[in-house]
Amino acid sequence: MLLIFLSSLAILTQVWYNKNMRIQQLHYIIKIVETGSMNEAAKQLFITQPSLSNAVRDLENEMGIEIFIRNPKGITLTRDGMEFLSYARQVVEQT
């Protein structure tokens, strides 16, 4: 459990210090999880679905983790994604 916490803390620290990282991307991740759909999240965020997908892909590349598993039936959080979501919510609540 401590290892998971430290790993998540390292991810969170990376988020804060990465100049290309924006809080908006964290909002995107949270909205995708809330809606369960990239399409619906994009509609509610008033952006295009390709823009949302690119923002998520950029975040995954910057962080070096896969947040979502994408398949024809929808998306699901990966294990790393679940940890990242927890800390993303904390960061968003504090801003």
List the model feature ranges, each with a label.
Residues 30-46:
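Short helix-boundary/capping micro-motifs
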Residues 26-33, 78, 85:
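Hydrophobic residues on short alpha-helical segments
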Residues 60-77:
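A short LG(V/I)-centered, amphipathic sequence patch enriched
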Residues 22-25, 49, 74, 81:
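The N-cap/first-turn positions of alpha helices
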Residues 4, 8-17:
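Short, positively charged and aromatic/hydrophobic N-terminal segments
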Residues 62-63, 84-95:
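Alpha-helical linker/hinge and terminal dimerization helices associated
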Residues 37-38, 56, 70:
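Helix-turn-helix DNA-binding elements, focusing on the entry/boundary residues of the two helices
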